[in-house]
Amino acid sequence: MTQTQPVGTLRLTIDDQGPQGQSRAVEQFHQGALRVIRPHYLDDSGQVSYTIIAIGGGYLGGDVYEQQFTVKDNAKALITTQSATKIYRTPQGPVTQYTEINVGENAVLEYLADQTIAYRESTYHQFTKVTLHPTSTFVMSEQITPGWHPDGKHFAYDEMRLHTEITDSTTGRLVLLDNLLLRPDSREGSFGWTEQYTHSGQMIVMGEGVDKQLVAELNEQLAAHPDVYGAVNFLSAPGTLLRGFIARTLSNRTEELINLHEHIASLLRGRWRGQEPVNLRKY
């Protein structure tokens, strides 16, 4: 992924050959500042759940992290984090995280991370490459929270860049190329950028069950939400059967964004797989 020596490396490969058809890790490698807690099964669906731990309490300037997740055909996995990712001052250069994700035929991956907290004078670059089979289900959510500032300033970080690519594994066609770039200092005030809101979120869902009716339903729910502002957009591309949606949201509280993302994930897992709602059991 990168020629720079990473501070933390994590690789997981998951199949469905465990006892009673449970999904399990057949390859697990970690080095440096990244670890995973022993797997859990949060319901009787056979979906395995892994929690990522970042040793050290926060990311520092110049740090590079690499993650690779592979979910083989028919396997089901949920990956989350133990706590928020904290980006401190980065005078030595940006913090960079590379993630590669591969999800096979009829496989499921829900990647529900805690918030990323960007403190003053910090720069964070995240590059995520996702390769999906058209019959797979992929859910990814993330939240960006401005860190504490002694002067009470909301947007004291320098730059946040979230670059995401999604490709069809059967045709090689690109379905999504998204580059979310936040540079608070390039804006005078918040008008036209985040209005009165301080926290931002995004959720990407790919699956056979996504259609324009579902997108319209989610937009109606967002419009009625008293504490979150946002929109959901349908994703598709010529030459591929992959389809999905991306939701962009704003709020003043991290919990509102996390609760919304977990609500959507629970709604879809219930409709598509008859599975119980998300319950990460962190608190």
From Swiss-Prot:
UniProt KW keywords: Chaperone, Cytoplasm, Nickel insertion
A Gene Ontology molecular function term of the record: nickel cation binding
InterPro entries, sorted: UreD
Record's GO cellular component terms: cytoplasm
Residue numbers spanned by region Disordered: 1-20
Coiled-coil zones: none
Subcellular location: Cytoplasm
Assembly description: UreD, UreF and UreG form a complex that acts as a GTP-hydrolysis-dependent molecular chaperone, activating the urease apoprotein by helping to assemble the nickel containing metallocenter of UreC. The UreE protein probably delivers the nickel.
Family affiliation: Belongs to the UreD family.
Functional note: Required for maturation of urease via the functional incorporation of the urease nickel metallocenter.
Cited HAMAP family: UreD (MF_01384)
Name used for this protein in its record: Urease accessory protein UreD
Origin species: Corynebacterium glutamicum (strain R)
Gene: ureD
